[in-house]
Amino acid sequence: MTHPDRSAHDLNVPIQHSGRWFQDNLGRTLLLRGINVCGSSKLPTRPYPGSTHLYDDILFWDHRNVSFVNRPFPLEDAHEHFSRLSAWGLTLIRLLVPWESIEHEGPGCYDEEYIDYLRQLIEMMPRYGIKCIIDPHQDTWSRFSGGSGAPGWTFEVAGLNIKHFKETGAAYVHNTNAVPGDPLPMVWPTNYTKLASCTMFTLFFAGDTFAPHRTYQSQSIQQFLNHHFIEAYRHLAERLSDLEAVLAFEFMNEPHPGYIGLDHLDSFDPIMNLLFGDSPTPLQSFALGDGIPQTVDVYIKSWPFPTKKSHDRVINASQTSAWFSGCVWKEHGVWTVDDQGVPRLVNTHYFSKHPKTGEKISFYEDFYKPLVNRYVAAIQSVKKEYYCLVEPLANEKPPVYNEHDHHHNVIFSPHWYDLDSVFYKKFNARMTHDVQCLQRGGNVFSATYFGKRGAKKNYRGQIKNIKEDGLLNMGEKPCIMGEVGIPMDLNNKMAFEDDNYENHVHFMDAIIYALETNLISFTLWNYDVFNDHEYGDHWNGENFSIYSVKKSEEDYMRHDDGNSKLSKKHLYDGGRVLEAVLRPYAAKVAGTPVSAEFNIDTLQYTFSFIPDCKGSTTTEIFVPYFHYGNKTIKTDVSFGRCSYIEEFQTLYHQYELNDPLPKLVTITMGILTTESANSCSVM
């Protein structure tokens, strides 16, 4: 039996696609697995180490003089991290590159030092069989509106004063609020209902429609922002165009419509929006930003609904303005102040109907797709082979693509989390809820599942719906789940004390089971080299990393044998929930995948495919040393034969072309036990 000269998960192959499947140059179907690198890349490294629990009254606001060099990690550490990820079979990296990291100094001023660093980092990837996706990452628009992404100067373009966001309630920024008594982590997503974030997204996607009178340097704000965003990533694409490891550019992480499409402006829908902590209505946000104090509702965590109103409080008693030159929405007649000084809505439907025609607005059709088409065309003008990943709005179906849209090498790339467990930071495998079902109008009884099997059924169904929505709305395109993962600080961080990650393993196993049984490629969230138990991923209280430097130090000391940190034994130091993450998967398939399933309890993996590949008869399955090292592998195959090379962590399945081909080939793999000693085995 002949063997390829590389491992199953080595992606040093040309990657093309046919319909919904990625393929290599031999026509084999590729199922890609990888990781986001990394959460702390949302923050600069200079002038002081970026972390949202840190604040400097001078340096934090000096947003033009920052650097993201060494995000995600210094070049001298790259060998360690790439070696580890390759050994873990996670060879597709979604590389976070926020707009701010490229163009923080000012419009058109690119940080070539940082881009040089990225080039050197990406140049190393082929040695480890790694490819990457460039992710223009953002959360709630920018660091200065409580998230990450856009440069600070974009607020100046819109006329907003970032130093006044706290007093006016325009944004909740952890850096400026990191004192005892403030709301717990997970308050950051509420910025999607706050003035700063909503205004910037509205101007970015639809400023020409909803704010045509507000300009910057004699240009509409929308066109100014769109031009610089697209040009920044087109410039990056040019600088990276000769690097074989760059597979794709994403359009935008978790895009948001801002105010676009809101049917009314006197409240937010609590089913579609997280109300937590201070929760001003859109009208109250307008008034607060314009220096008018407001009494706003304050929400706290509850059950079965995520939050409930606890009390209210007065915001902006100082009558501070968030604007340099007046509220853009008052200027455009959305609201006014009556003779008694009370804010009043003039047109509560302003953002749901076109201001001139009165026609119903569609965010996807009128604003999102046209900009995505422009971006994709710009990126592929540099290199037509680049894939471009397009993400739907969070927890919503994707846009419907028609013949006028840019289809070439466009990939559907949704995200999915168990929002219930992420918000409460609890999981015990006894009960889970289908938040997707609830958001689509289901009731709490039909959306409740019990036990580990129930969790798997719950998640599998949700992922199936997302996949089918993509195929229906965007057409026969591959799907990469761009983000999916679990918080590691579950259940009051008990695992950090007793090192018992059993619940975490069940949680992650149920999620990856849902992905593998739906035959979806994915990049987990996330691998962060700065993760520790106290501050997690160092961004807004999140702690998702499957690697922790704190745990790495403890693991290494626990079984220090004098060998290198990169020896087989130590490559797993620092890993969290690896029992669930590291699992077999058919990476290169000589045909069309039909089904896949891994049993974490028995370590049995079953994979079926239709043997219809014309260019190769070899299927390659990643077999993690973590589970199967120094053990005898047992295989049962319905057709063909198998061999296993432990050094490559790969099980090879082959058949002869001149043999009569069956309709389906099934491969079952596990560990040889005394009970199964009579079965076929490979060493």
UniProtKB/Swiss-Prot annotation:
Reactions the enzyme catalyzes: a beta-D-glucosyl-(1<->1')-N-acylsphing-4-enine + H2O = an N-acylsphing-4-enine + D-glucose
GO cellular component: membrane
Annotated source species: Rhizopus delemar (strain RA 99-880 / ATCC MYA-4621 / FGSC 9543 / NRRL 43880) (Mucormycosis agent)
Protein's UniProt name: Glucosylceramidase
Hydrolase among keywords: yes
InterPro entries noted in UniProt: GH5_C, Glyco_hydro_5, Glyco_hydro_b, Glycoside_hydrolase_SF, Glycosphingolipid_Hydrolases
Gene3D superfamilies: Glycosidases, Golgi alpha-mannosidase II
Location, primary (coarse class): membrane
Active site: 254 (proton donor), 483 (nucleophile)
Physiological role: Specifically hydrolyzes the glucosidic linkage in glucosylceramide. May prevent accumulation of aberrent glucosylceramide containing immature ceramide.
Subcellular location: Membrane
pH dependence: Optimum pH is 7.5.
Signal peptide positions on this chain: none
